[in-house]
């Protein structure tokens, strides 16, 4: 069978070679046909055997797979039951308080509880001690304030009483002057005759202007006493008399000026540390907090505050100095 190609030259060159090859291959093709017919018959028998074998093996595989699935399910159920029994046993140990997983954290918690309880007890004692100290400081400050107020009240009452005594003494001296008039008046009354006596006094003839006193002698005496008291109190020519009770003089120089305290030639300001000395008591140190017109507030080392009156410094009941 001729082969058509793109060029004619190519067809002529290969024509002879194809004839030679065809003659050689003709003998071999007959042999191949015989072998192929025998192999086809053998392949038909083997294919039937392969199908049966595959079906058989497929069934075996399915059976084996089902067995494996059943075994896996059984193992899974068994493992679940074992794990459940282990968890139940561990839970019973925890409930009974014997599991090490429970005992170790429990011991740690108990140790922490003991430490915190101990710390809380120490803190409680410190708080109680602090409250007790504050209470004692308040009591001490209240007592000192009461003593200061008592001394101030005593000084005030004493000065008022001394002033009253002085005025009474002045009144007594002024009354002594009028008492002589009172005695003279009484003596003159005694010397008078009885008004019911038959002897009558002759009328006095007065020439020129005259004043008729319509007041009684006792009223005139009372008016005279009142005038003498007013003159002794407000008159420009007041006669000063020494009172019987000597007033307490200022032994020390103390005053307050523009927020500063002057005492015995030294100046004190707020914030300075001073030493307070009182008779029959130990000296104490304090810090000046406030300086008013007539009092000085200071703070003691224990935190309590007290005040000191400038009049007490003047009278020498207290003395201060720079610390």
Swiss-Prot record:
Q: Name one GO biological process term.
A: negative regulation of transcription by RNA polymerase II
Q: Does the keyword Acyltransferase apply?
A: no
Q: Per the record, which residues fall in region Disordered?
A: 1-56
Alphabetic keyword roster: Coiled coil, Growth regulation, Isopeptide bond, Nucleus, Phosphoprotein, Repressor, Transcription, Transcription regulation, Ubl conjugation
Q: What does this protein do?
A: Involved in the histone deacetylase (HDAC1)-dependent transcriptional repression activity. When overexpressed in lung cancer cell line that lacks p53/TP53 expression, inhibits cell growth.
* Biased composition annotated in UniProt, kind: Acidic residues: 18-53
Which residue stretches does the UniProt record annotate as biased composition, category Basic and acidic residues?
Answer: 1-17
Taxonomy of origin reads: Eukaryota, Metazoa, Chordata, Craniata, Vertebrata
Which chain positions lie within coiled-coil regions?
Answer: 52-84, 149-180
The set of disulfide-linked cysteines is: none
Cross-link of type Glycyl lysine isopeptide (Lys-Gly) (interchain with G-Cter in SUMO2): positions? 240, 246
How is the subunit organization of this protein annotated in UniProt? Component of the Sin3/HDAC1 corepressor complex at least composed of BRMS1, BRMS1L and ING2/ING1L. Interacts with HDAC and SIN3A.
Question: At what positions is Phosphoserine found?
Answer: 197
* Compartments in which it is found: Nucleus
**What InterPro entries does its record include?**
Sds3 (IPR013907)
**Protein name, as recorded:** Breast cancer metastasis-suppressor 1-like protein
UniProt xrefs under SMART domains: Sds3
Gene3D superfamilies hit by this protein: 1.20.5.1500
* Gene Ontology CC: nucleus; Sin3-type complex
């Amino acid at each position: 069978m001729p082969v058509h190609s793109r060029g004619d030259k190519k067809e002529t060159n290969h024509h002879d070679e194809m004839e030679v090859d065809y003659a050689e291959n003709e003998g071999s093709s007959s042999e191949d046909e015989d072998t192929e017919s025998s192999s086809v018959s053998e392949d038909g028998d083997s294919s039937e055997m392969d199908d049966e074998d595959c079906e058989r093996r497929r069934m075996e595989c399915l059976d084996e797979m089902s067995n494996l699935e059943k075994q896996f399910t059984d193992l899974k159920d068994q493992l679940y039951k074992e794990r459940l029994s282990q968890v139940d046993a561990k839970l019973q140990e925890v409930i009974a308080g014997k599991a090490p997983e429970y005992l170790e954290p429990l011991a740690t918690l108990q140790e922490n509880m003991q430490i915190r309880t101990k710390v809380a007890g120490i803190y409680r004692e410190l708080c109680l001690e602090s409250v007790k100290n504050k209470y004692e400081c308040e009591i001490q400050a209240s007592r000192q304030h009461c003593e200061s107020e008592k001394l101030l009240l005593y000084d005030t009452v004493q000065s008022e009483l001394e002033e009253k005594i002085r005025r009474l003494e002045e009144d007594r001296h002024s009354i002594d002057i009028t008492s002589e008039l009172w005695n003279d008046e009484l003596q003159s009354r005694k010397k008078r005759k009885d008004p019911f006596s038959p002897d009558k006094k002759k009328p006095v003839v007065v020439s020129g202007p005259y004043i008729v006193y319509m007041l009684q002698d006792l009223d005139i005496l009372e008016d005279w006493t009142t005038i003498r008291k007013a003159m002794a109190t407000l008159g420009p020519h007041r006669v000063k008399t020494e009172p019987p009770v000597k007033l307490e003089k200022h032994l020390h120089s103390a005053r307050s000026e523009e927020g500063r305290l002057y005492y015995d030639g030294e100046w004190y300001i707020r914030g300075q540390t001073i030493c307070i000395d009182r008779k029959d008591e130990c000296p104490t140190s304090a810090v000046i907090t406030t300086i008013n017109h007539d009092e000085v507030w200071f703070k003691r080392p224990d935190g309590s505050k007290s005040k000191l009156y400038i009049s007490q410094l003047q009278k020498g009941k207290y003395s201060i100095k720079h610390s």
